[in-house]
Amino acid sequence: MAEPPKLRVLMVSDFFFPNFGGVENHIYYLSQCLLKLGHKVVVMTHAYGNRSGVRYMTGGLKVYYVPWRPFVMQTTFPTVYGTLPIVRTILRREKITVVHGHQAFSTLCHEALMHARTMGYKVVFTDHSLYGFADVGSIHMNKVLQFSLADIDQAICVSHTSKENTVLRSGLSPAKVFMIPNAVDTAMFKPASVRPSTDIITIVVISRLVYRKGADLLVEVIPEVCRLYPNVRFVVGGDGPKHVRLEEMREKHSLQDRVEMLGAVPHSRVRSVLVTGHIFLNSSLTEAFCIAILEAASCGLLTVSTRVGGVPEVLPDDMVVLAEPDPDDMVRAIEKAISILPTINPEEMHNRMKKLYSWQDVAKRTEIVYDRALKCSNRSLLERLMRFLSCGAWAGKLFCMVMILDYLLWRLLQLLQPDEDIEEAPDICLCHHRGVEVSEGLRKKIK
Amino acid sequence: MLSLNQEVHGPKTSEVYGFVGSISIVVATVIFLIWGYVPDKFLESIGIYYYPSKYWAMAMPMYSMVTLLVALVFYIGLNFMSTSKPTSLNTLFDDYSREDVNFLPLMKNGEDRPIDPISDIDITRINDLMFDSHLAK
């Protein structure tokens, strides 16, 4: 007889498997650890090609692939009210207690949070990215975020820098924002049993080759380092628009034998690439957090990274060499890293990472945020409208109208299909221990 | 050097764009309102004779709003069309389905176990767990 689940969490985002990225990994690992703590977790995302409908995944994680077409960069088109019926049905079927939205750029997340608040559910939001304040896209995105978070219970950011950024952009009270970092599965990212020799120093780069990840910096840094240190070679994993520039750099400086381009690296193969190196190079121009350097440090690599966003918070000072996002400074940082490389002990570094970052710890801290959200008092529609009104002279009134209409539509749905008429989905109890699964298999055979 | 220049001029450029943008919008709004509301006689009396038909002052906003509404209806209809039929196999399998892979089958006691990689659980097993009273206990 399984214990009744403590909490029933709905994770909402446009980004989930089969898409790959930091947000997708975060949602998956967090869900797995929450399931192990005894909670029930359901994920809601949009359909990916033929992957549509309901799926059950590892650990009994139920995923709703809502048939909603992505519009741009895997984000759905904002319809404001279009998702209200399906969100209501899912919340009711799964008897959800907390709705957890992920990523500021996810349309589905913002709409689901809005509808959940209208229906009186507790909502938590996690922001995974940094945004600027001065370009047209950021200005509009910040206004949407202000609307979406004006009425939220609790928010989570992945670094202190990210928290400052989110608080400034959305006008959210800092007391409502928790800092819970990303983590790394240290059991998966272990150092090589035999460390590669330092006669040839290998520097590993694994990231998407796009502007935001600083691929243009690599084009200038790699030839300079190769010129200064004949015994250095590079391994570059990842694909993207800047791939051609890096290939041109290899041709131009005749570095075909010293710079290896791997192309896209599946996440399951990242460790086998990392353990071949001594130094990990991260050249991002903006990062709220950087899971890649966590994975590298867990594998025992010394990290060289640009000093941007939340990166300085990620690792202790003796595990990372920071540089400004400038080719000359990055070359100097790599020189410094090479000079301190003999003092690095990969096994010791891995053990420290095991203590510093683990998804189990992230899940426990998220649990605290959920409990805090559940303690927040329920607010009537009028109180919520007051909050929206304070968002701006014109925007506030517009937000109020949007919310009033949302409330009326919800009432209309209740009239057309009362809550009692929505069938509740049965729960499953999936055993996590391998031994019990085997016995279940035997029991099936007995039948 | 190039990045240094960008740093020096970047914020100012953004501020200039913002300032010019806001002033332009205010001026454009005033002109639009004058065009839409001031009678023809007054405009002609101060020498303004040539301007687009006032009809468009009403038509353009209405066209835009109706286009947006129709686009929303179209998008939601498109989503309904893309919904799989109840009998479709895509509700069970698809291009991205993954079998459960048990790597690291030999686990020593006390050794850390990685979080299981993402994979699908077969629907028959879910049905057994959900509805078979024996296994539910």
Curated annotation (Swiss-Prot), chain A:
Chain ranges passing through the membrane: 388-408
Keywords associated with the record: Endoplasmic reticulum, Glycosyltransferase, GPI-anchor biosynthesis, Membrane, Transferase, Transmembrane, Transmembrane helix
Pfam family, one: PIGA
Parts of the chain on the Cytoplasmic side: 1-387
Catalysed reactions, semicolon-separated: a 1,2-diacyl-sn-glycero-3-phospho-(1D-myo-inositol) + UDP-N-acetyl-alpha-D-glucosamine = a 6-(N-acetyl-alpha-D-glucosaminyl)-1-(1,2-diacyl-sn-glycero-3-phospho)-1D-myo-inositol + UDP + H(+)
Tissues expressing the protein: Expressed in roots, stems, leaves, flowers and pollen grains.
Biological process, per Gene Ontology: GPI anchor biosynthetic process; pollen germination; pollen tube growth
Source organism, top-level taxon: Eukaryota
Record-level Gene Ontology MF annotations: phosphatidylinositol N-acetylglucosaminyltransferase activity
Lumenal compartment spans: 409-447
Gene3D superfamilies: Glycogen Phosphorylase B
Record membrane topology: Single-pass membrane protein
Entry EC number(s): 2.4.1.198
Compartments where found: Endoplasmic reticulum membrane
GO CC, alphabetical: glycosylphosphatidylinositol-N-acetylglucosaminyltransferase (GPI-GnT) complex
Pathway assignment: Glycolipid biosynthesis; glycosylphosphatidylinositol-anchor biosynthesis
InterPro entries attached to this UniProt entry: Glyco_trans_1, PIG-A/GPI3, PIGA_GPI_anchor_biosynthesis
Main location (coarse class): endoplasmic reticulum
Family named by the database record: Belongs to the glycosyltransferase group 1 family. Glycosyltransferase 4 subfamily.
Purpose: Necessary for the synthesis of N-acetylglucosaminyl-phosphatidylinositol, the very early intermediate in GPI-anchor biosynthesis. Required for pollen germination and pollen tube growth.
The protein's name: Phosphatidylinositol N-acetylglucosaminyltransferase subunit A
The organism of origin for this protein: Arabidopsis thaliana
Origin organism lineage: Eukaryota, Viridiplantae, Streptophyta, Embryophyta, Tracheophyta
Swiss-Prot record, chain B:
Enzyme class: transferase
PANTHER family documented for this protein: PHOSPHATIDYLINOSITOL N-ACETYLGLUCOSAMINYLTRANSFERASE SUBUNIT P-RELATED
E.C. code: 2.4.1.198
Membrane topology: Multi-pass membrane protein
Transmembrane helix keyword on record: yes
InterPro entries: PIG-P, PIG-P_GPI19
One Gene Ontology biological process: GPI anchor biosynthetic process
The reaction(s) this protein catalyses: a 1,2-diacyl-sn-glycero-3-phospho-(1D-myo-inositol) + UDP-N-acetyl-alpha-D-glucosamine = a 6-(N-acetyl-alpha-D-glucosaminyl)-1-(1,2-diacyl-sn-glycero-3-phospho)-1D-myo-inositol + UDP + H(+)
Alphabetical list of Pfam families matching this protein: PIG-P (PF08510)
Pathway: Glycolipid biosynthesis; glycosylphosphatidylinositol-anchor biosynthesis
Protein function: Part of the complex catalyzing the transfer of N-acetylglucosamine from UDP-N-acetylglucosamine to phosphatidylinositol, the first step of GPI biosynthesis.
GO MF annotation list: phosphatidylinositol N-acetylglucosaminyltransferase activity
The name this protein goes by in its record: Phosphatidylinositol N-acetylglucosaminyltransferase subunit P
